[in-house]
Amino acid sequence: MTRIKSNWKFLLFVLLSGLVGGYCTGLYLPATFSSEMMQQLQEQGVTNELLVLSTMIQYGILYGVVLAAIGVVISRKVYLWKEFGFDKKGVAATAFISVVAALILFPGDKMVFGRFNSWVHDQYNVPPGLPKIISGLLVGGVIEEVMMRLFLMSLLVLIISILFYRHAEKVPTGVFVIANIVSALLFAAGHIPATMAMTELTPLLLFRCFLFNGGFGLCFGYLYRKYGIGYAMIAHGLAHLISDLLMIVAVSI
């Protein structure tokens, strides 16, 4: 009964995070679209209100609570599920990954890739508004971790285990590593459509997408495997929050 109650609390948390994060995403998303994308949406009759509603359903229900429920079941089956609790090493690893990832996003991204691409450079000239900050915390920190780590990474571990280690007493560490790498690459690839909606996709931006998101994904996957999905969520969310706050300070100076 305790386990069921714990799962329901987690699923409720994911649902609320997805609904609020989806709402905030729908609010700021139109401002990031290219003129061509906005014209396509207008031609299809997609209003701002409809966009907000669709992002709420998408992140709250489809990508959120549905995948979270499946992910909990699978992660328990492959022994990846860990109840959230204080872990000194987990806190230290999460803090380190969060700060490093945040600094890579800002000012790192602007200083490196911003020199070669005006679109990247311009992303850091405007301070993020409250909807974008909340979206980074909840959609990035919670929903993306549900999708890519709790669900996808766990599913990959299960599939590989069934195919190659059906009679093994326990899942080899290499299976978790492979699943983490594949899910990180897919996590990076999942950001390509969003980039294409905002600007022209160039080889440089493609490399940047896989370098940043793939690298971050590996780190979040490590936290998930070692300390549980809660620590992966915290690291992902904090990376967005810290980089956003640094950007606000830098722009206001």
Model-derived features: positions:
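Residue-level signature of transmembrane alpha-helical entry/exit and packing/kink sites
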Residues: 7-14, 52, 56, 60, ...
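Transmembrane helix-loop-helix hairpins at the membrane interface
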Residues: 131-253
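Membrane-helix interface linkers and caps
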Residues: 29-54, 61-92
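Hydrophobic alpha-helical transmembrane segments
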Residues: 50-65, 135-148
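Membrane-interfacial helical/loop segments at transmembrane boundaries in membrane proteins
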Residues: 31-46, 119-127, 206, 250
